[in-house]
Amino acid sequence: MFRVLAIGNSFSQDATAYLAQLAAGGGVEMEAVNLYIGGCSLATHWENMQTGAAAYERERNGASEGRTVSLAQALEEGGWDAVTLQQASHDSGWPERYFPYIRLLAGEVRARVPGARVWVHQTWAYELDSDHPAFAQYGHNQSAMFQALEAAYHQAADSIGAPLIPSGAVIQRLRSLPPFDYAHGGRSLCRDGFHMDRLYGRYALAAAWYECLMGQDVRDNPYTPSPEADAGLLALIRETVHGVCAEQRA
């Protein structure tokens, strides 16, 4: 079994909602655990690591287990193959807000779970008309927010020698395609202006995580998250995910 632990917030909750099920579609048995605190930043994760606060709701394969744990407790379960780190979306475009916390957290993860590979999960830019209070930091401009977080995430990942899961780049690429071009009548990939749509948005994130973590071509994966899903849109998402991930590997 491949075990992945996401140290995150509601954005990693979106990313892991379908991940284990999609992996099963590719013949991979996976346990995807998300440590959830809403809006949690790298600075707060580091504070919680130091204090040992049992502040994280433990979610397994997209569902809450109804219990809280500390970071140390989760890491010391052992058996993790991958551990992901991410910045809170509101801080994602500001490189100085990643440090020193991402280096400190990566060091703790590697010390406590030496068999795990550390990954950085790139979050995404808000929807064009998002009313998220932090959108003002980016001039209420989705493109500006994406460009800022793209640069910041690559800098952060490089600083700790960790590969990047390019979720933000995947979402931005999809937004350039007619079915998801919200500015011109396409459907939004967000459900509330910043969290992912529960069908296609979450599916796109799971596909990106699967292709990166497992190194498998998601275009070959038959998993369908809902009978209501449009097969053509799912295929477009898989093709887009594969393209973005291939560009990153090149």
Model-predicted segments: where are they?
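Charged/polar positions on well-ordered alpha helices
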Residues: 25, 159, 207-208
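Conserved catalytic region of serine esterases and O-acyltransferases that act on ester linkages
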Residues: 186-250
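Alpha-helical cap/lid subdomain in secreted, periplasmic
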Residues: 69-198, 211, 220
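Conserved SGNH/GDSL esterase-like catalytic core that processes O-acyl groups on lipids
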Residues: 3-5, 11-99
